[in-house]
């Protein structure tokens, strides 16, 4: 992509997404995340009315009467965007590809973090770690992330959510807010997700094109796997073929849901045929009420 064209796209996306941040989203981000990080400060003697869950049992045993832990809010948070750039992200039947929506949502989250003076970083992944941008503050850094997301051309096309989470668990030591933006057309990442979810506040953002839910009955067509490049003829009118595809899609979706539920992690479903801001805002408002 030419530099002039790239800068134009970045500017257009910045105007659109920062408008959404200012008008709709930043309040939800601030309410849910700002000050949620807590760090240990000191201990003091237990007083009537204190939350018994904060009792420090080691100190209590040592002095033979109860002490509680005092925590302070961590005003500065770190937001990490794990963005799937594999081949399946270049699909879209609704005028925009999954990757386009992933870029816009990432921009909204990056600008929200910037507006709240938080650090933001990004990890772009396929079945390899394509690019890692360490978390930093500031407008220029948020714009750098947006530029990379718009212009980046991955070297690989397959998907490994496990690989991305393992890398995250290795490089990011401080507890962070982690968004995994993907269609989650993958498996065998449950252990890595559970570990990452214990270390970080992890939220999945699943992108779904409605055309992917079932095969359209259009007769004999050539299908190309966006991640492997393999091609084959498929009779979409064959009921057995349609049933097998539907069963596969259900198994992938059931695995994703069960994995997030078991790890006690939140996720958001974003359909490409509907505006993405409503499910995002609804989710954060629901989460704010839970706090």
Stretches found by the model and what they are:
Residues 58, 154-158, 180-182:
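Short, flexible loop segments at the rims of nucleotide/cofactor-binding pockets, characterized by
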Residues 103, 157-161, 249:
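A conditional alpha-helix N-cap/helix-loop micro-motif detector
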Residues 1-33, 42, 51, 170-174, ...:
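Von Willebrand factor type A / integrin I
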Residues 132-147, 258:
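Short, electropositive alpha-helical surface patch
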Residues 83, 182, 205:
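Active-site flanking residues adjacent to catalytic metal/cofactor-binding acidic residues
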Residues 1-135, 177-179, 187, 259:
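An amphipathic, basic-hydrophobic helix/alpha-beta surface used to engage anionic
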Residues 105, 163-167, 252:
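Well-ordered alpha-helical segments embedded in enzymatic catalytic cores
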Residues 141-176, 188, 209:
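Von Willebrand factor
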């Amino acid at each position: 992509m030419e530099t002039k064209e790239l800068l134009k796209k970045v500017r257009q996306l910045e105007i659109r997404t920062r408008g959404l941040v200012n008008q709709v989203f930043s309040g939800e981000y601030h309410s849910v995340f700002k000050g949620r990080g807590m760090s240990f400060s000191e201990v003091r003697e237990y007083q009537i009315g204190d939350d018994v869950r904060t009792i420090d049992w080691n100190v209590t045993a040592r002095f033979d009467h109860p002490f509680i832990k005092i925590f302070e809010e961590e005003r500065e948070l770190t937001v990490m965007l794990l963005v799937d750039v594999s081949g399946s992200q270049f699909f879209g039947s609704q005028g925009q590809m999954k990757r386009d929506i992933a870029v816009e949502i990432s921009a909204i989250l990056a600008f929200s973090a910037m507006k709240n003076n938080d650090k933001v970083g990004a990890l772009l992944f396929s079945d390899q770690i394509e690019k890692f941008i360490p978390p930093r503050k500031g407008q220029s850094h948020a714009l750098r992330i947006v530029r990379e997301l718009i212009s980046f051309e991955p070297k690989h096309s397959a998907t490994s959510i496990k690989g991305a989470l393992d890398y995250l668990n290795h490089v990011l030591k401080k507890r962070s807010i982690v968004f995994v933006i993907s269609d989650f057309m993958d498996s065998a990442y449950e252990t890595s997700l559970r570990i990452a979810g214990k270390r970080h506040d992890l939220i999945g953002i699943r992108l779904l094109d409605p055309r992917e839910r079932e095969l359209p009955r259009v007769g004999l067509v050539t299908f190309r796997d966006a991640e492997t490049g393999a091609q084959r003829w498929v009779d979409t009118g064959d009921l057995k073929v349609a049933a097998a595809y539907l069963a596969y899609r259900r198994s992938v979706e059931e695995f994703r849901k069960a994995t997030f539920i078991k790890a006690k992690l939140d996720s958001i479903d974003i359909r490409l045929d509907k505006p993405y801001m409503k499910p995002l805002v609804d989710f954060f408002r629901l989460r704010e009420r839970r706090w």
